[in-house]
Amino acid sequence: MNTVTELLQPVENDLDDLILELKNLIGAGHPILQAAAEHLFSAGGKRLRPGIVLLISKAISPEFILTSKHKRLAEITEMIHTASLVHDDVVDEASTRRGVDTVHSRFNTRVAVLAGDFLFAQASWHLANLDNVNVVKLLSRVIMDLAEGEIKQNLNRFDSAQSFSKYINKSYCKTASLIANSCKAAGVLSGINDENLTSLYDFGKNIDLAFQVVDLSLIHI
């Protein structure tokens, strides 16, 4: 297995359904947000984070069946991730992301900020409707980490002497916290024990950090 596409093949159809559902959830009743959602979720991308949540959810299910709550958790994970990217692009004044126009360059900064805010709000609403306070705590922590990570990145933007541990800590806040806590949340929804919850958290954290280190290395090679 050499590609992300191969990795996510067992949940390929579920991911297609997820993107369609996200477009409907986010754009309903809001023409501008509908256009922004169509742009965001039609741009392709690996969909690695919701894909891993779906794979984990299937793996820990006795009958390898995804429940509606696990599917919604994957949608929430992608909403939070996408919202953070929209805001990051505004802060970084980036005109493209992986060859695709960013929301603020396609529309304007006001629409981008509001679209990101709306995604975070939608994620919070659907998170609350999972009716599981422990899952709410996990994903609420993620949103705090995202803001903290962005602040750390901007404070150390020109620090050429930044240590590897500081880089890892910043990367955890900006990206790894989301997949780590989402994987753990999948386990919480399945009612598995604390030891296995910790294993799910560590798996999500380490796979994301490894991905970020490799991605950064490829940029500088």
Regions from the language model: what does each represent?
Residues 178:
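Active-site helix-to-loop segments that bind/position phosphate- or nucleotide-bearing substrates
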Residues 1-82, 86, 90-105, 141, ...:
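Conserved N-terminal diphosphate/IPP-binding helix and adjacent helical/loop segment
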Residues 219-221:
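Conserved small/polar residues in nucleotide/adenosyl-binding loops
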